[in-house]
Swiss-Prot record:
4-aspartylphosphate modification, residue list: 55
Molecular function in Gene Ontology: DNA binding
Entry's transmembrane regions: none
Signal sequence extent: none
PROSITE patterns recorded: HTH_LUXR_1, HTH_LUXR_2, RESPONSE_REGULATORY
Gene that encodes the chain: agmR
InterPro entries, per the entry: CheY-like_superfamily, RcsB_transcriptional_reg, Sig_transdc_resp-reg_C-effctor, Sig_transdc_resp-reg_receiver, Tscrpt_reg_LuxR_C
Keyword Ribonucleoprotein: no
Protein name in the entry: Glycerol metabolism activator
Chain ranges of the HTH luxR-type domain: 149-214
Stretches assigned to the Response regulatory domain: 3-120
Family matches, as SMART domains: HTH_LUXR, REC
DNA-binding region: 173-192
Entry keyword set: Activator, DNA-binding, Glycerol metabolism, Phosphoprotein, Transcription, Transcription regulation
Length: 221
């Protein structure tokens, strides 16, 4: 079904993620490696890989430098960072440097399976619990959101706000359609309108900028 490389220096975690893949995606071929050099070697031998699950802190990585090296050597193979890191800025940098997703090692099994499925379907996955971590503890004025001016948010319809809120929770278009009881094609149309109205180029920019919006306040309109 799929051909996936797990690059992580912890045998127990490799075994755990291996089981997630074989249970969630039967028939998939899974390869494993424990350092960046071996990962680079395997990607050179297997350019038909569908996905690389890359640990941020295994030998040879030097943080995000290893991701950059891997993307340079294998630019056509999607790479997902799988890490215990919880810093939102690191997540943002990983996406900026070419990762198509970021999965935390503390993710429940079902969430990890869903994240991998979203990525294999061509979507970008961001951990919703981290994306929404930088809310102020006090009540913020609606004009203070770091990502968007209030007039941009006010241009969104109620349904578009609901879709954007679901996007920040890490939901795929299919999940949003189910939860809002609308067609998936309608969700795609809303997402396109959201990106246009907010003047962003892609879904990731929208999600990262909208992570600390108080949707409840806007939806009271």
């Amino acid at each position: 079904m799929y051909k996936i490389l797990i690059a992580d220096d912890h045998p127990l975690f490799r075994e755990a993620i291996h089981n997630v893949i074989t249970d969630g995606f039967p028939g998939s071929e899974v390869m494993e490696t424990a350092d960046l050099d071996s990962a680079l070697s395997l990607t050179g031998q297997h350019d038909d890989l569908d996905l690389i699950l890359l640990d941020l802190n295994m030998p040879g990585m030097h943080g995000l430098g290893g991701l950059i090296n891997l993307r340079n050597e294998a630019p056509t193979i999607p790479v997902v960072i799988v890490s215990a890191e919880q810093d939102k800025q690191v997540v943002l940098q990983a996406i900026t440097y070419g990762a198509v997703g970021f999965i935390t090692k503390s993710s429940p099994r079902s969430q990890m399976t869903d994240a991998i499925e979203q990525i294999l379907n061509g979507n970008v996955y961001l951990p919703p619990d981290i994306i929404r971590t930088q809310k102020s503890t006090g009540r913020r004025n609606q004009s203070e959101h770091a990502g968007f001016a209030p007039e941009l948010l006010q241009a969104l319809t109620r349904k578009q706000l609901l879709v954007l809120e679901r996007m920040t929770k890490g939901e795929s278009n299919k999940q949003i359609a189910y939860n809002l009881d609308i067609a998936e094609t309608t969700v795609k149309a809303h997402v396109s309108a959201i990106l246009r109205k907010l003047n962003v180029h892609n879904r990731v920019q929208a999600i990262l900028s909208a992570g600390d919006i108080d949707f409840t306040a806007y939806l009271r309109r």
